[in-house]
Amino acid sequence: MLSKLPKSSKLVVIGGGIIGCSTAYHLAHMGLEVVLLERKKLTSGTTFHAAGLVGQLRTNANITQLLGYSVDLYNKLEKETGLGTGWKMNGGLRLACNNERWTEVQRQTTTAHSFGLEMDLLSPKEAQDLWPIMDISDVVGAAFLPTDGQANPSDITQALAKGARSKGATVI
């Protein structure tokens, strides 16, 4: 492995999980010289254990915007690299089973709209129409964010690494 190490690099990223590979990907796409170092195999750390759920709405507009960017990236990464990411835009459902939670879900929907996200308030029956096996006997209301989804973190990491390599990054 030491023979593969370049003598120098402008930037070195330590860790070949989704964060390290994303960092290398974006730096390489900016035209910067980058080396990514992983001590074992890509995704062999915490990325391997991640659930891969991608919910975009947060209380902070900047984080919500970053998560929206991630959704856009997952949509294009497969085309760019030829590697699957497991990305499925199947939406996210938020349930309210009491009036206090319903008020919170309504506020979240208002926040989503102010951040430019499509999020719809639903009756219990409308929520059940989306997921027919759901028992709605105690559901007061729901909200659905159609652009949320799920992905395979290991697959995304491999695609990010390939995308970084395609722009000149060295992944060791």
Task: Describe every region a protein language model picked out.
Residues 3-6, 28, 87:
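Short, flexible hinge/linker loops that cap or flank conserved catalytic cores
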Residues 40-42, 127, 160:
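Short beta-to-alpha linker loops that shape the active-site pocket of alpha/beta-hydrolase fold enzymes
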Residues 52-130:
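Dinucleotide-binding Rossmann-like beta1-alpha1 core, especially the glycine-rich loop
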Residues 24, 28, 163:
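Gly/Ala-rich phosphate-binding loop of Rossmann-like dinucleotide-binding domains
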Residues 143-172:
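Helical element adjacent to the flavin cofactor pocket in flavoenzyme catalytic cores
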Residues 28-48:
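Glycine-rich FAD pyrophosphate-binding loop
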Residues 3-19, 35:
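Beta1/beta-strand and adjacent pyrophosphate-binding region of the FAD-binding site
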